């Protein structure tokens, strides 16, 4: 297969995965946006975490809320727990990498805040501990997962929301995660500030 054929194949795989995910995920994304808007209207904030590409997604979500998405609007309170290398390496060195997010959540999280927890497998130990810490702090969890939801899915409470991408390929799951994040940002803006039609 030549390179351009491979590129077309990858584009088509991404399109197919998004098409399959659209109807499955729409109600979950809607519910997650409502949970987030309710938190923001009640003086809550968004915390987000993930590893690797999912850390990038956590930061992307946080920056869209803090700065802007596609319209001018006031900044919204959001903290990506993936950005402070001194804190992360300190916790990893003194305790364990599994606690790099949970310790931050125990310090920063308040009842009514929302944790956006991102893992393509749903099995990242530090994300699982982050969810447990969020529940201890009476936070609501929005989980972006893939495959079978992993250990994260079994930890979620009735008030939590799982957005599970119906795919098994990490790259395809990540692509849908980013689209879901953009949908969340759009829905948050429209619910808080009105539609821009």
Swiss-Prot record:
Record text on cofactor binding: Binds 1 zinc ion per subunit.
Major enzyme class: isomerase
A GO MF label: carbohydrate derivative binding
One Pfam family from the record: SIS_2
Binding site for substrate: 51-53, 64, 93-94, 119-121, 124, 174
Sites where the protein binds Zn(2+): 60, 64, 174, 182
Pathway given in the UniProt record: Carbohydrate biosynthesis; D-glycero-D-manno-heptose 7-phosphate biosynthesis; D-glycero-alpha-D-manno-heptose 7-phosphate and D-glycero-beta-D-manno-heptose 7-phosphate from sedoheptulose 7-phosphate: step 1/1
Protein name, per record: Phosphoheptose isomerase
Species this protein is from: Pseudomonas fluorescens (strain Pf0-1)
Main location as per UniProt: cytoplasm
């Amino acid at each position: 297969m030549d390179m351009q054929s491979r590129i077309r194949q990858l584009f088509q795989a991404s399109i197919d995965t998004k098409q399959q995910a659209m109807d499955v995920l729409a109600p979950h994304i809607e519910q997650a946006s409502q949970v987030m808007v309710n938190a923001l209207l009640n003086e809550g904030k968004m915390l987000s975490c993930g590893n690797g590409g999912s850390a990038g997604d956590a930061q992307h979500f946080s920056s869209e809320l803090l700065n802007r998405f596609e319209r001018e609007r006031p900044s919204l309170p959001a903290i990506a727990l993936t950005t402070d290398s001194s804190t992360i390496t300190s916790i990893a060195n003194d305790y364990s990498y599994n606690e790099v997010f949970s310790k931050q959540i125990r310090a920063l999280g308040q009842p009514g805040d929302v944790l956006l927890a991102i893992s393509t497998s749903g099995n990242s130990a530090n994300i699982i501990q982050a969810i447990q810490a969020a529940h201890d702090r009476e936070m609501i969890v929005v989980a972006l997962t893939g495959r079978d939801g992993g250990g994260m899915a079994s930890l979620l409470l009735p008030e939590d929301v799982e957005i599970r991408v119906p795919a098994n390929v990490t790259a395809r799951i990540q692509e849908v995660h980013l689209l879901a994040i953009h949908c969340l940002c759009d829905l948050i803006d429209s619910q808080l500030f009105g539609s821009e039609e």
